[in-house]
């Protein structure tokens, strides 16, 4: 199986993955929220709600949401967890612009700030945030382990990292239906709704290739996180990964 880091939205295009991902999300931004609801029958909202509930066991004053997209997770965290601030970063200006409008509509401008940012080079000092999250974005990283190291760097000792990522069901009963849906139905809907024909073919390819379960937990451990856990949801079609930064970790842990 090809490494997910080598799977790009536009295949043989010579540009690096980050550039292709930015172009893809700029193109599909107007249809992105609708497609998320349609593809998951609205279950993506339940997955985010579950993730935020897992964070609620401790108070987090400052939260970073990486690959924030149109801000769904950032907005839910701001409205539920009562943080002082939620910062969301994303490569796509078009996605961020839609997210800013949603933040304004939710009257959360004083709590949520969205801006352009690269997960591999986060513009924040060491040990800045109490929690770092990323929903459905890890598949798009050009280097997953480097992205996790950056998350670890900007997280305060004792802080939490939480990842939501799409995954492949392990059940031999569920998997054939899932494969048909992701490889045939979703790309067809994408071609009808979105300007970008390739984007929704890239989706099942990247899901199939992204590290899952124990393999993803191993990457979190390699980046320095403690006790990573994988929590499968909805027959294993989505997985939440959660881990901690060691409380004794020195503040200056630059890589």
Set out the residue ranges of the language-model regions.
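Conserved alpha-helix/loop element of class I SAM-dependent methyltransferases that forms part
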Residues: 31-34, 41-61, 76
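C-terminal alpha-helical "lid/dimerization" subdomain adjacent to the S-adenosyl-L-methionine
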Residues: 164-223, 229
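Core SAM-dependent methyltransferase catalytic element
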Residues: 226-255
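A short glycine-rich, Lys/Arg-flanked "PGG" loop and its adjoining helix->strand segment in the class I
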Residues: 145-160
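Class I SAM-dependent methyltransferase SAM/SAH-binding core
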Residues: 62-121
């Amino acid at each position: 199986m090809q490494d997910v880091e080598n799977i790009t939205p536009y295949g043989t295009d010579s540009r690096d993955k980050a550039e292709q991902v930015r172009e893809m999300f700029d193109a599909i931004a107007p249809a992105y929220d609708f497609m998320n609801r349609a593809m998951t029958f609205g279950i993506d909202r339940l997955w985010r709600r579950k993730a935020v509930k897992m964070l609620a066991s401790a108070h987090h004053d400052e939260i970073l949401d990486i690959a924030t997209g149109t801000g769904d997770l950032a907005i839910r965290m701001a409205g539920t967890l009562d943080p002082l601030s939620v910062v969301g970063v994303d490569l796509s200006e078009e996605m961020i612009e839609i997210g800013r409008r949603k933040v304004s509509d939710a009257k959360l401008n004083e709590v949520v700030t969205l801006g352009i940012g690269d997960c591999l080079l986060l513009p924040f000092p060491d040990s800045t945030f109490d929690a770092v999250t990323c929903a459905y974005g890890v598949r798009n990283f050009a280097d997953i382990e480097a992205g996790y190291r950056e998350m670890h760097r900007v997280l305060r000792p004792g802080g939490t990292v939480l990842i939501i990522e799409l995954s492949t069901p392990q059940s031999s009963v569920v998997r054939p239906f899932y494969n048909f849906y992701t490889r045939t139905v979703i790309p067809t809907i994408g071609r009808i709704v979105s300007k970008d024909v390739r984007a929704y073919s890239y989706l099942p390819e990247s899901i199939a290739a992204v590290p899952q379960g124990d393999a993803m937990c191993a990457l979190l451990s390699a980046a320095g996180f403690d006790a990573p856990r994988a929590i499968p949801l909805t027959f294993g079609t989505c997985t939440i990964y959660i881990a901690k930064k060691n409380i004794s970790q020195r503040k200056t842990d630059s890589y």
